[in-house]
C-alpha cells in the first residue's frame, strides 16, 4: 500500500514538473515573439477598408498635365489611406475625342483589376484641399466631388462634370455613359439624366473649409483648344446631342486595346491603356473632325 502511494505521489510530482516546464517555454516564446513584433514595422500603407478605387482618366495629348497629375493624385490618395489604381485611358485613333466612351472602357479595365469603386477624374483638375473625400461612397450613392460651389469654373445647378465617384455596380446599373458624344462637352449633362431616371442618390460634396478658388487647381493651359461639340453650324448635332440616349452605353462601347503599359512619373506608376474607339458613321457621322 505504501509503495502504491509513493508511486502515485511520484507520478503527480513528475506531471507537475512537466507542466511547469512547458509553461516556462510558453512564456519565453511569447516574450521572444513580442520582442520581434516590437522591432517590426509594416512597410505597407494603412488601409482604412477593403475597398479599392480605380481613378479613371480619359486622356489624349496632355502629357504636361499628366506629369503633374500622376504624382499629385497618388500622394493625395495615399494621405487618405485609399487603396487605388490610376488608369489613363488614352485615345489613339484619329477620331474626335470621346470622353464618355473612354470612361466606359475604363470601367471594363477597373472591373478586370478588381476595383469596387471608381472616380472619373479629368487630368487637368487636381484636388488641393485634403478634406476632399475620395473614400468609398457606398452602394447607391453617386458623389459629385467637384460640386458647383467648389469647381473653379462651372457652377450651374445640374453640373456633374470634373470629378464624379460611384461604385462599379452602380455605373453598370446606369449602363455607363452615352457613346454618341464626340468632341468636348454635353456627355455629363446626359449622364445627369441617367442618374435622375435611376433614382440613385446623387450627393454633392459640401461643408469644406475652402471655396471655388482654392479647393481644386485647374491646370488646363490656354493653348489647349477644346473641340467643342456639337459644332455650332451643325443643327443635326444639336438635335442628337440634346436628347436622352436610351440606346448606347457601357454594354455596347466598341473599341480595340492597342496596348497596356506602365509609366513612371516622379516615382508614381500609372497604367496607360491605349485605345482605338470605333465610330458608327451612320449614327454619329460627326465623329470625324
UniProtKB/Swiss-Prot annotation:
Record membrane topology: Single-pass type II membrane protein
Keyword terms, alphabetized: Glycoprotein, Glycosyltransferase, Magnesium, Manganese, Membrane, Metal-binding, Signal-anchor, Transferase, Transmembrane, Transmembrane helix
Positions that bind UDP-alpha-D-galactose: 58-62, 97-99, 123-124, 154, 184, 218-220
Glycosylation sites: 81, 90, 201
Positions bound to N-acetyl-D-glucosamine: 186-189
Keyword Thylakoid belongs to the record: no
CC terms in the record's Gene Ontology section: Golgi apparatus; membrane
GO biological process, one term: reproductive process
Enzyme class: transferase
Highest taxon above the source species: Eukaryota
A Pfam family recorded for this sequence: Glyco_transf_7N
Primary site of residence: membrane
UniProt keyword annotation of Transmembrane present: yes
Residue ranges, compositional bias (Basic residues): 217-226
Protein's name in the database: Xylosylprotein 4-beta-galactosyltransferase
